[in-house]
A protein has these predicted regions:
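Short glycine/proline- and charge-enriched loop/turn segments
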Residues: 58, 118-124, 170, 189-192, ...
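Short, glycine/acidic-enriched loop or turn micro-motifs at the edges of active sites
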Residues: 108, 156, 173, 375, ...
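Conserved ATP-binding subdomain of kinase catalytic cores across diverse folds
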Residues: 20-117, 124, 136-147, 272-380, ...
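Juxta-kinase regulatory segment immediately upstream of eukaryotic protein kinase catalytic domains
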Residues: 1-33, 228-288
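Conserved protein kinase catalytic/activation segment
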Residues: 158-170, 421-432
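C-lobe/activation-segment region of protein kinase-like
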Residues: 167-239, 429-478
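Catalytic-loop of the protein kinase fold
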Residues: 149-156, 412-419
Length: 478
């Protein structure tokens, strides 16, 4: 295959791919065996073999290939020139009307810090394991900054452990202020803002403690916490908006198809599993365990290839109901978006897997939402033995405190906080049924909505019960 043919290969070209390339030593064939990242028509990154040696290949095609190639090459050279630990560039080339390629040494038995973080992310905030991962990352970032460089697309997956070393990867994101001289304070604050904004908000009280790892390797500037927090908040807000935008467009995270006859959105890594589920959603619901049927919605647990899922069908009851619904986004879309919002914010909820809106010449009709199934129990069942005594397990009460604190931090109101919508799952309380959920832009509107949520939640138990009185005393208010 010629490199230029990759431009039309789509997201999942058949592997292996044999590409004829040439470097200073002459022509040779690259055999691409796996794909790690794909931006269709522009970028293909994967593992392969070149001149008998395993390599990581970055293949750049399309109109933007020359610019992307130069940016990648410049970044790699900057890292090497400043003595940073980065994979060795073995071969590179740019051919007019074909594209560009960069072949790097393949790091065997490697693990990104992103993968390492995923293993410890849900542990107690800033325990030793978390501190080790984040401290290692901050030390590497500090060393980069001492050389006048920064990683524009800074995240933990761009730091790779292999054989006792930590490698900086992705030269395309490397920027330089003045090579060899420490980065200015403003650039440091901006770049650290990008890093800390990606961490769970539960770690926010530990920012200053974590910063010590950075300052031990780069003490060039005093870093005011207020200025750093301002950068963190700015980036965090942008990242949430960007992520929510992606839930409605075709990208590496989501497969989205929209037209006059409907809208379909699926998590990219669930596409193969969810397409047949959406195609037979009604039949699966009919055969499943129904929690709610008829009226505005039907909800049921279904089994697909040994996997439990929940399907919620948003019905159109009659013509009058259709006239109220066809012109605005469906409740399925709202729940899809809000479920993804909660996951992004680190608030437990069943993962939304797929969405389908049926449309007739663009006018909305029935809609479907598929999510993971949480076995429960809900909080009514879980706390039933403790209503009279109030002796609910402290760990579960602390988890409930944390859920309410998260809602306050993010200005989230649920809209129907009855006990059957709060589930115990993996040592956390998870929210389900997000049809009325809202993230408020103003504190005043949030305070009113949260007060309603809290009052509805407390009505789950008799006001004179010990459990009610305990929760009334300890659950946070605004």
């Amino acid at each position: 295959m010629r490199l230029s043919e990759l431009k039309n290969a789509g997201r999942t070209p058949a592997l292996p791919i044999n590409l004829a390339l040439a470097d200073a030593a002459g022509p040779a064939e690259l055999q691409l065996l796996t794909l790690l990242r794909v931006l269709p028509g522009q970028r293909y990154v994967g593992a392969g073999v070149w001149r008998g040696r395993p390599v990581l290949a970055k293949l750049l095609v399309g109109q933007k290939a020359p610019r992307h190639f130069q940016r990648e090459l410049e970044g790699v050279r900057l890292l090497a020139a400043q003595g940073m630990t980065t994979p060795l560039l073995l071969a590179d080339g740019l051919e007019q009307n074909e594209g560009g390629w960069l072949l790097f040494e393949f790091l065997e038995q490697s693990q990104s810090l992103g993968e390492a973080w995923a293993e410890v992310e849900h542990q107690t905030p800033l325990n030793d394991a978390q501190q080790a991962v984040l401290g290692e990352a901050l030390s590497a970032i500090a060393q980069l900054h001492t050389k006048g460089l920064w990683q524009e697309d800074l995240h933990l997956d761009n730091l790779l452990r292999s054989h006792g070393k930590l490698y900086l990867i992705d030269g395309a994101g490397i920027r330089v202020e003045e090579a060899g001289k420490p980065l200015s304070r403003q650039k440091v604050l901006e770049n650290l803002g990008v890093f800390f904004a990606q961490l769970p908000k539960s770690l926010e009280p530990f920012t200053e403690e974590l910063l010590v790892h950075y300052l031990l390797s780069n003490g060039e500037h005093g870093l005011p916490m207020e200025a750093l927090q301002k950068q963190i908040d700015k980036v965090r807000s942008w990242r949430l908006k960007d992520y929510l935008d992606k839930t409605g467009r075709d990208c590496s995270l989501f497969s989205v198809v929209e037209g006059a006859s409907g809208l379909r959105a699926i998590r990219r890594d669930e596409e193969a599993a969810m397409l047949p589920v959406l195609a037979q959603a009604d039949e699966l619901l009919d055969q499943g365990h129904l929690y709610k049927t008829g009226g505005a919605a039907s909800v049921g647990r279904v089994e697909v290839n040994g996997r439990s899922l929940v399907i919620k069908r948003y019905n159109i009851k009659d013509v009058a109901h259709w006239f109220k619904r066809f012109w605005r986004p469906s409740r399925a879309w709202h729940s899809w978006r809000e479920g993804n919002r909660l996951l992004f914010l680190g608030i437990a909820t069943p993962k939304p897997l797929a969405l389908l809106e049926q449309r007739f010449i663009g006018l909305r009709g029935k809609a479907y939402l598929v999510t993971e199934y949480l076995p429960g129990p809900d909080i009514i069942e879980r706390f039933a033995p403790y209503v009279a005594s109030g002796d609910a397990p402290e760990s579960e009460l602390v988890a409930l405190d944390e859920l309410f604190q998260q809602m306050i931090r993010e200005r989230i109101s649920h809209g129907d906080l009855k006990g059957h919508n709060v589930f115990w799952h993996q040592d956390r309380w998870a929210l389900i049924d997000l049809d009325a959920m809202c993230q408020h832009s103003s504190q005043s509107s949030f305070a009113t909505a949260f007060a309603r949520d809290r009052a509805r939640f407390m009505r789950n138990w008799p006001a004179d019960s010990a459990l009610h009185q305990l929760l009334e005393q300890r659950l946070p208010k605004v």
